[in-house]
Amino acid sequence: MDDKLMLMIPGPTPVPEAALLALAKHPIGHRTSEFSNMMGEVTQNLKWLHQTESDVLMLNVSGTGAVEAGMINFLSPGDRILVGSNGKFGERWVEVGQAFGLNVEAITAEWGQPLDPDKFAQKLQADTNKEIKAVIITHSETSTGVINDLVAINSHVKEHGQALIIVDAVTSLGAYNVPVDALGLDVVASGSQKGYMIPPGLGFVSVSPKAWEAYKTAKLPKYYLDLGKYRKATAKNTTPFTPPVNLMVALHTTLGMMKKEGLESIFTRHERQKNATRAAMKALNLPLFAADECASPAITAVATPGMEADKIRSLMKKRFDIALAGGQDHLSNKIFRVGHLGFVSDRDILSCIASLEVVLLELGHENFNSGAGVAAAARVFSN
């Protein structure tokens, strides 16, 4: 029997029915007062979500495009930058920097381990000539389920005084507290298919006054991703290029849902679902790839010693129409990843865990008591 696909991956994430209905509406003109009024509300709600009074700009890109825009608008060829790399996406920002002729110094950690703030401190404190122009980190490393210590790393950047802090918040914004103004974050990039609860296609970049000062002298080439164009257009509640109108209508809907729930409730929900998922995996005797103290609220990576992770994922899809994410690069077939990001309910978590128990038993992983995973998650949810 055909079942309803359950997306339990870190993106694209499930889309609420209200947003699906918004996507199905007849398009409106993007140079009309109707669109401008809607965009004005969306922009204000984006500032609410980012906890900022500064600009939050919308681009027709994925999260990668948003991060690239967040780099190239504020830097010049040959600029020295520090890039934290402890997973697939940290590695990507190293590659982007190299592609644009930046002097990239990677500060690395093993996949599954958090970045060490002290390593950033050492580099920044030694930079007495203030040659480091930016520090770029991935807040929630989607490939491993690790949350990096943004607060600690940012504090060292602030002590440096000159470098910008540029943050990939693609799977943390909307799941974890990212108070842009309170932390003084210069550039924060994210994507629509994550905590925003709509399909891929929109990227978001918040920009501080300090970053706009750097923009004035930045010399890396840009046209479509020139944030200055977006800033001027956004001030008039319009866009520099044709936007994905219906995606923005859907975003208007989901941001309204988020405001109704409230930031603290959103963060609490993601933390609760993370804890339930991790408790279940421990009860099923499946090793967690990230330690509790650095676990992302958006995704849980699970190791599968003695089993092929892709067989688990395949059987979950075949038997229960539940999609789990796989490992990337050298972690391929060695881990699976459970997304608990955006429009995911406690019921979804319980359904996923119950289905996983069946699959594990079918694959011969029997060193757990039947129902142990569900019971462990239920205890978290009942508190």
Curated annotation (Swiss-Prot):
UniProt xrefs under Pfam families: Aminotran_5 (PF00266)
Main function: Soluble hydrogenase catalyzes both production and consumption of hydrogen from suitable artificial electron donors or acceptors. This subunit catalyzes the tritium-exchange activity.
Subcellular location: Cytoplasm
Protein name: Soluble hydrogenase 42 kDa subunit
Keywords annotated in UniProt: Cytoplasm, Oxidoreductase, Pyridoxal phosphate
GO MF term list: alanine-glyoxylate transaminase activity; L-serine-pyruvate transaminase activity; oxidoreductase activity
Cofactors that this protein relies on: pyridoxal 5'-phosphate
Gene3D superfamilies associated with the record: Aspartate Aminotransferase, domain 1, Type I PLP-dependent aspartate aminotransferase-like (Major domain)
SUPFAM superfamilies, per the entry: PLP-dependent transferases
Any one GO cellular component localisation term in the record: cytoplasm
EC code(s) of this entry: 1.12.-.-
Chief location: cytoplasm
Species of origin: Anabaena cylindrica
Coiled-coil regions, chain positions: none
EC class: oxidoreductase
Modified residues (N6-(pyridoxal phosphate)lysine): K194
Top-rank taxon: Bacteria
Subunit structure: Heterodimer of a large and a small subunit.
Family membership: Belongs to the class-V pyridoxal-phosphate-dependent aminotransferase family.
GO BP of this protein: glycine biosynthetic process, by transamination of glyoxylate
UniProt-listed InterPro entries: Aminotrans_V_dom (IPR000192), Aminotrans_V_PyrdxlP_BS (IPR020578), PyrdxlP-dep_Trfase (IPR015424), PyrdxlP-dep_Trfase_major (IPR015421), PyrdxlP-dep_Trfase_small (IPR015422), SP_NH2Trfase/AEP_transaminase (IPR024169)
